[in-house]
Design a protein with these regions (language model features):
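Short amphipathic alpha-helix that is part of the acyltransferase structural core
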Residues: 2-47, 165-166
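A conserved beta-strand-loop-helix scaffold within acyl/acetyltransferase catalytic domains
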Residues: 50-96
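Conserved acetyl-CoA-binding loop-helix of GNAT-fold acetyltransferases
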Residues: 97, 103-116
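Conserved active-site alpha-helix within GNAT-family acetyltransferase domains
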Residues: 108, 119-157
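Acidic/histidine-enriched, glycine/proline-rich intrinsically disordered or flexible terminal extensions
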Residues: 158-166
Length: 166
């Protein structure tokens, strides 16, 4: 079987079994909004339900759930989102683990899965942005921007509007 098609095996933790799901088309945007707000994730606090819907339409949402025995549902305890142009670049977003589940390897499994997910395609590089989790990512081969081959630039939409470009 193709390695890319394999969903990570469930993992046993002191809290119970954590199972992994590709919920790109099944997770409710409201559930994501509640999860990210409950975990006090600063970069998602402003997202509306409609924005979550649009984000899910153009990327893959990989989740970790604390599942009761013999169940497919369960409490959302981890998530990451991956976007790809399917040829050159993919980007990791929203890597989050529930605070009471940190240190169990959930984020590691989610990131590894995102990096090998078949939906991403045959890209040449992965990128991500982080303010406070930079020490987590070198284990996967990520390096700080100044070690890359290009300058990372961005512009906010309000600046484009100010300049009459949008």
């Amino acid at each position: 079987m193709d390695r890319d098609l394999l969903v990570p095996e469930p993992m046993s933790t002191t809290h119970g079994t954590v199972a992994f799901f590709d919920e790109s088309w099944t997770v409710e945007p409201k559930e994501l909004q509640i999860f990210f707000q409950a975990e006090d994730v600063y970069w998602t606090s402003h997202r509306t339900i409609e924005q979550w819907r649009r984000l899910l339409a153009c990327s893959r949402m990989l989740t970790a759930r604390l599942v009761p025995e013999g169940s497919k549902g369960g409490r959302l305890v981890g998530a990451t989102r991956v976007w790809s142009d399917h040829a050159y670049e993919a980007k990791l977003y929203d890597v989050v683990t529930a605070q009471d589940m940190m240190g169990l390897g959930i984020a590691t499994v989610l990131v590894q899965w995102a990096l090998r997910h078949p939906w991403v395609g045959d890209v040449q590089r992965f990128v991500l942005e982080t303010r406070d989790a930079a020490p987590f990512y070198p284990r996967f081969g990520f390096a700080r921007g100044e070690e890359m081959d290009s300058v990372h630039m961005r512009v906010r939409v309000d600046e484009l509007k100010r300049r009459g470009l949008r």
